[in-house]
């Protein structure tokens, strides 16, 4: 279904309710630049670096797009998805059945979920929705739940330390969304709905979270304007 959630005036903050879940795949593919390319890149990196039967957790897995991309390359892996939205997991389960993919999918708050013994953890465009006061503790949890040599891959929207550059990037991004068929009204509506819900960090702040948690290295593997994907090694 085509995303038309913000064509109507909104009266609440953004949440992943039924109205969003029903159009989520269209929404994210038109709202996040190079979304499909990022999923493909993550899948390729993990497929090259993980041992047979390695355990992968996608935290905030939404409709399981990333897990299904990995499954296409490495069906031997233990693929696990966690999302707090029951509607998201229902859609993910239906998709996994359609692909004949053996995915383990859980409805849970990722802050409370036990994913110990992981070989890889994925966190795509999810950390930005976690309250800043809880982010450092959560990244430390990811580090402690990964096995030695484990991989942490995450994607985030960014702010820049230079305020003018941040504003320029916001304008460039909103022009991108307009080119994807969103009206200026829809763009403004979503921006308002996400205010104080999606709180991005800078590239350096995201890297510092990983290094402070104990990861031995962290690199940016993809970046476009105010979006980036990172990889960290335990």
Curated annotation (Swiss-Prot):
Pfam families noted in UniProt: Methyltransf_31
One GO MF term attached to the UniProt entry: S-adenosyl-L-methionine binding
Record has S-adenosyl-L-methionine as a keyword: yes
Transmembrane intervals: none
SUPFAM superfamilies listed in its UniProt record: S-adenosyl-L-methionine-dependent methyltransferases
Domain of life: Bacteria
Catalysed transformations (reactions): prephenate + S-adenosyl-L-methionine = carboxy-S-adenosyl-L-methionine + 3-phenylpyruvate + H2O
InterPro entries xref list: CmoA (IPR005271), Methyltranfer_dom (IPR025714), SAM-dependent_MTases_sf (IPR029063)
Root EC class: transferase
EC numbers: 2.1.3.-
Record has S-adenosyl-L-methionine as a keyword: yes
UniProt-annotated binding residues for S-adenosyl-L-methionine: 35, 60-62, 109-110, 124, 191
Keywords attached to this entry: S-adenosyl-L-methionine, Transferase
GO biological process: tRNA wobble uridine modification
Membership in a protein family: Belongs to the class I-like SAM-binding methyltransferase superfamily. Cx-SAM synthase family.
UniProt cross-references to HAMAP family, sorted A to Z: Cx_SAM_synthase
Stated role: Catalyzes the conversion of S-adenosyl-L-methionine (SAM) to carboxy-S-adenosyl-L-methionine (Cx-SAM).
Complex formation: Homodimer.
Protein name: Carboxy-S-adenosyl-L-methionine synthase
Species whose genome carries this gene: Campylobacter fetus subsp. fetus (strain 82-40)
Gene that encodes it: cmoA
